[in-house]
Amino acid sequence: MGGLEKKKYERGSATNYITRNKARKKLQLSLPDFRRLCILKGIYPHEPKHKKKVNKGSTAPRTFYLLKDIKFLLHEPIVGKFREYKVFVRRLRKAYGKREWDAVDRIRDNKPAYKLDHIIKERYPTFIDAVRDLDDALSMCFLFSTFPRTGKCHVQTIQLCRRLSVEFLNYVIASRSLRKVFLSIKGIYYQADILGQTVTWITPYAFSHDHPTDVDYRVMATFTEFYTTLLGFVNFRLYQTLNLQYPPKLDYFSEADLKSDNEDKYALETEAYMEKLAALSASLSRVIPSEPEEENEVDEFPADPENAGQEEEQKKQLQEEEKHKSMFVGLKFFLNREVPRDALAFIIRSFGGEVSWDASVCIGATYNSANPSITHHIVDRPSIQTQIINRYYLQPQWVFDCVNARMLLPVEDYFPGVLLPPHLSPFVQEKEGDYIPPEKLRLMALQKGENPEDDDDDDEEDDEDEEEDDEDEDDEENEEEEEDKKLRHLENKKVGQNKLNVRITAGKVKVEDRTQAAEQEKTEEKRLAIMMMKKKEKYLYNKIMFGKKRKVREANKLALKRKAHDESVKVERKKKAKKH
C-alpha cells in the first residue's frame, strides 16, 4: 500500500548536496563569477559525512555545496549584475573592433555597478557582529594599503584600503583601545578592545613587495572588495560613538601646528591632508567641541556582603585599565629617522603620549629634536655622539615591551648598544605545569611591585662565593688529610676500652600529623575512585593524565636546557674576566 519506490541516491544526504558544476549551471555563471558570488555572500563548500553516497557511488574528488545555499543565491540581485557585466564587455569589445569611439565612451559611461550594502546588513544583523568579524578585514586592508602601484591590483583599491586603515588607526588612538603589541617575523600584531570585543590584526613591515606568482590576486581582490565595504560601515559607526566628524578632520589647533613651508616637497595638494591624517600625530575634530576631560569615577553602591570581594576585584581591574590607557601621558617622544615611525607613533599616541620626528622624514612633525621638554628619544644605533642630559635615549623595543607589561619598564636594559632582553609574546597565557622563562618571572615580579634585582645580586654573590671556593679547595684538601690521620691514631688507642652503654629512656607520644593524614585519605579515595571507573572513563582519565605528564616532562626539559645555557654563559663570563 506504499507509494512509488524511490530510486537509489534520491533521498537522504544525496539530495542535500550539489556539486560545484551543477550549482554553477543552475545559476548560469562562469566559474570566476560563481567563486566571487560565494565569497561575497559567505557561502562555503561542505564536506559530506558519507561522500560516496552523495557522489552517487563514485569516489572521484568533487566540491560540494549545500543545496539550500545555492537556492538562497538564486534570489541575489548581484547575479543579474554579473550577467549585465558580461553583456557590457561583449558590447565594448564589439565597439572597439569597429573603431566606434563615440560608442566606446557611451558604453563605458553606462558600465553596470552594484553595491554590497544589503549583503553587509544580511551577514551582520547587529553592529557588534560586524565588530567581532573585523580581524580578517583589517589584516587584508592593511596588507593592500602597502602594495605598490602595479598591475596586480587596482590603484583605487589600494587608495581606499589606505584611507580606511588610517581612519581606523585614528579611532583606536582617540578611544585609547589598544591593549597588546607583538613584533613577529610575519609583521606586527595588534590587539584592541573595541566596544567590549577583542579585535586582533596584523600589519606588514614597511619593506618593498615582491609579488609571488602562486597567489590568486583576483580572489584576494574579491575579499578586499567585501572587507572595504564592511570597514567603511564600521568606521562610520565607531566615529559616531566618540562624537568625531566623519570623514575625519584634523582639529583646528592641531592643523595649525602641522602647517609647514615645505609641504609641496613631500606630497601634492590633494594628498597632503591625507598624509597629515596618516602621520597620526594630531587629534581629530569633534562634531560638538569637547569640554576638558574629567577623570571617570566608578559609581559606588551600598556594599553587598556576598559579592564584596568580587566588586573590589572589578574596581581594582578598572583602575588598572585606566592606568594602562594613560601610561605615556605627560611623556614626549622624539623618533630618529632609522626607527619604524608608523608603528611607534601609533602606539605612543594610543597611550596618551606626544610624538614627533625630524621634519625631513615625513609630514606631521610637531616639534624638533632640540625641544627641551622631550623626555624619551627613540634611537636604533649602537652609539650616539652628542646626547642631551635631560632625556632618555632608548631602543624602540622599550615602547613595545612597556605596552605588554602594562607599566613603564626600567630604562637601563634598553640603552643604545645594550643587548636587549627577549621580546616576550603577550598572547601566551601560561597554565599550571607550563614552563615559564626567567624573563617572564622577572616581569611578573615587577608587576607585583617586587624588586627582582635583589635576586640578581644574590646570584652574583653566589658566583663570587663559588670562585672563592674553587681557590680554597686545595688548602681544604690538605687540612682534611691531616685531620684524618689524627682521627685514625686516636681510634687505634681507644680500641678495646669502649664499653657498650645501655640506657632506658621514657617513651614519647608520637603526635599524628593531621594534614598528612588528610592527604593520605584523599589519595586513597582517589585511588578507589579510579578503580571504580568504567572502562571508557578510565581510558579517558589515563589519556588526560598522560597529556599532563607529557606537559610536565616538556617543561622540565626546557628548564634543563635553560639551566645548561645559563651555566655555559657563566663559564664564558668567567673566562673573559680571567683574561682581563
From Swiss-Prot:
Keyword terms of this UniProt record: Nucleus, Ribosome biogenesis, rRNA processing
Chief location category: nucleus
Listed GO CC annotations: nucleolus; nucleoplasm; PeBoW complex; preribosome, large subunit precursor
Stretches for region Disordered: 291-321, 448-496
Compositionally skewed regions (Acidic residues) per UniProt: 291-303, 452-483
Highest rank taxon of the organism: Eukaryota
InterPro entries: BRCT_dom, BRCT_dom_sf, PES
Residue span(s) of domain BRCT: 323-416
SUPFAM superfamilies attached to this UniProt entry: BRCT domain
Subcellular location field: Nucleus, Nucleolus; Nucleus, Nucleoplasm
Subunit structure and binding partners: Component of the PeBoW complex, composed of bop1, pes1 and wdr12. The complex is held together by bop1, which interacts with pes1 via its N-terminal domain and with wdr12 via a high-affinity interaction between the seven-bladed beta-propeller domains of the 2 proteins. The PeBoW complex associates with the 66S pre-ribosome.
Main function: Component of the PeBoW complex, which is required for maturation of 28S and 5.8S ribosomal RNAs and formation of the 60S ribosome.
Protein name per Swiss-Prot or TrEMBL: Pescadillo homolog
Species this chain originates from: Xenopus tropicalis
Lineage: Eukaryota, Metazoa, Chordata, Craniata, Vertebrata
